[in-house]
Amino acid sequence: QSVCFVEDIKADLARRDFTVNAIAYSPTRGMIDPFSGAEDIKNGIIRAVGNAHKRFSEDALRILRALRFASVLGFEIEPETARAAFELREKLTAVSAERVFSELKKLLCGAAAYDVICRYREIIAVRCPLAADIPDICRLPHDPAMRFAAVCGAEAENALYALKADKATRTRAALFAGCRPFPAGEREFRIAAARLGREAAESIAVYRDVLYPECSAARINTLVKNGVCLSLDTLAVNGKDIRALGVRGADIGAVLNGLLFAAAAGDIENKREDLLRCAKVMVDKRKK
């Protein structure tokens, strides 16, 4: 659609999406608010300017924008505006994936996200598959990957791929959606954390503690506080050290991971001499 420029400020404001955005200020005339946007802000109301069906038909993304404003600001969507959003929700299928993703990630990180998702589930589901049971995502950190994982469940990665989300968000969402409970045993718990790496283990522990209270975050924090090695970058040896032992190719990574898991489990100390001694034993066993 082409954009026509108008000189009349009121005519311009009449084309805005919501009354809260249809306010202007003139140094000579002061506040220009023909649609009572200031009153709606005061009362916490999201209301379409004029005919809601017309506004949403002009750009269906406005439907998600209404939900996003309600989520972020904690506002209520005015009944007629909400009704039009439900009736025209299928128009969202024609909106580009990138624009939809941009709105959804802001919506999911809003202070009232859980309430908005529950109320307007049918609208969101047009472009984003939702799990049967959605947890209170407002208890999670403001992390789009975590929140998409929580609301989409096993479909998180596919949903984000369809929305053309960035690879990092897709990968992290898949990690959260597919994460399993941490082992109860201390040794197994340490190894599981090391397999994930410190950063991922800390994030997953927070995620699981919110959705399935396990006290995993406290356990991870204790390991970190006590200096337990949970990632290769904190291991006292590196690839060059292992290469010096005659190891080549993928075997270098295998040996390093073996040392990492042993150090995390407490089987050996994270000291260069001890690790190299253990590495030599591992290398000798591989040669036999």
Enumerate the predicted regions with their spans.
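Catalytic cores of the polymerase beta-like nucleotidyltransferase superfamily
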Residues: 1-288
